[in-house]
Amino acid sequence: MENIKLACSLETNQTYIIAVSGGVDSMALLHYLVAQKIKLQVVHFNHLTNSNTWKNKELVKNYCLQNSLGFHYFELNCPQKNFQAQARLLRQQKLMQIAAKHRTPFILTAHHLDDLAETILQKISRSSTLLGYSGMQIQTSWTDFIFLKPFLYIPKAKIISYAAFYKIPFLEDYTNQKLTYQRNQIRHQVIPYLKTQTSFLQNIQKYQQTLLQAYNFIRKQTLLFLTKHTNHSCNQPNSIALAPFLNLDLVIQKDIILLLLEQKNITQSFIFIQNIIKGINNPYKPNLSWHLNSDWHLIKDYKHIKLMNPALPLPFALTKPLLCVSTCNLCLVCVCPLIETLNYNSQKVSFPLKVRLRQPKDTLKFSFGTKKLKKFLIEKKVPLTQRNNLWLVVDNLDNILFIPQLYTNLTLGNQFRIYLAFKNFFTSSNCFSQTN
């Protein structure tokens, strides 16, 4: 019997959790690892799809007893709608539960080269990302756990030959023959034909490895860019500088957006990602927002790209600031280092002064006339997400006197002088454009 060569090395001093269905693939992997004296904890799932599933349980359980292996059994009652995806998620959860119990991060499954081919063809038929088109990886991480596929580059035929040579007991799952599932159609109709025409499985392995190399290079460039151009300041947490982003190749831009979504466990379609990239690169739409899910929006403004939770208050609008007014500027230094001077004539300012948020019809006064605050903010390139959260200083007649870092009314005369400062006011030189 030709030796089996695993896709990844396993250590004899480490414990591994292995999912075993009772089929030929998982029973062959279990047999091989037992022979290699790998420490194992076996997990078997009963999907309750037919009355004969107890036979698989007894087969796996007896094999574990004969080889002094830990055996863990779960019954999964999944809804028929989207059955396969729901079952996969439940299996992952239970496997991680057992791994945590035995204090090991390693979880093994018996996916093989034919499985890889099926997955790649499925991804091509449905569209995917570059990583998705590569099908499966030998190693993937999920929270604190590492899923390994030691048989990933071994053809199914070789596994069957191995099982026959060592007389390994196994049971076939009849659902693998049902052509109602696309995967089974690919398995029984498409792949057998392709195998007769080319060295299909060997080419699948080369294809997967080529895509993974390209993906790894692109992701490396993505991480380098984010390390250099991600803003971690309190007013723009985890925002990405827009200008250098626009200079990137489109494939890197797309991977950056994909990574942002991955970090929030957000899945979106290829077309949706394309629309985001198109919008970010549109110079005529400086303020855009994309609804990703109930918790997150992706925001583009004049200078940044960022994920934002619409349910959370913006950092610069947490609390209403306290306005401090004095005729002595030194008296306000301890309140705020940013002190504004306001000159005025008594007939042009009506006290007391107040602080309020921006309103739709607000108008600013200049020496040349008036201008709508909305237009002024657009010209100053104030991000849309910040415009409705601006604190304004107004007099008792609601005339706008001062907007921190943006505007001071210079049409009030020079008879008197006062100094203004905000206590508990969020300030940052990066908040707004400083153009005149």
From Swiss-Prot:
Q: Which Pfam families match?
A: ATP_bind_3 (PF01171), TilS_C (PF11734)
- Tell me where in or outside the cell this protein is found: Cytoplasm
Q: How does the record comment on the protein's domains?
A: The N-terminal region contains the highly conserved SGGXDS motif, predicted to be a P-loop motif involved in ATP binding.
* Gene Ontology CC, one term: cytoplasm
What the protein does comes down to:
Ligates lysine onto the cytidine present at position 34 of the AUA codon-specific tRNA(Ile) that contains the anticodon CAU, in an ATP-dependent manner. Cytidine is converted to lysidine, thus changing the amino acid specificity of the tRNA from methionine to isoleucine.
Q: Which GO terms describe its biological process?
A: tRNA modification
Name this protein carries in UniProt = tRNA(Ile)-lysidine synthase
Family, according to the entry, reads as follows:
Belongs to the tRNA(Ile)-lysidine synthase family.
NCBIfam families, alphabetized: lysidine_TilS_C, lysidine_TilS_N
Please state the gene responsible for encoding this protein: tilS
What EC designation does it have? Answer: 6.3.4.19
> What is the reaction catalyzed?
cytidine(34) in tRNA(Ile2) + L-lysine + ATP = lysidine(34) in tRNA(Ile2) + AMP + diphosphate + H(+)
Q: Which GO terms describe its molecular function?
A: ATP binding; tRNA(Ile)-lysidine synthase activity
| Classification via CDD domains | TilS_N
- Species of origin: Aster yellows witches'-broom phytoplasma (strain AYWB)
Q: Give the residues the record marks as binding ATP.
A: 21-26
Organism's domain of life?
Bacteria
Checking SUPFAM superfamilies in the record gives: Adenine nucleotide alpha hydrolases-like (SSF52402), PheT/TilS domain (SSF56037)
> What SMART domains does the record point to?
TilS_C
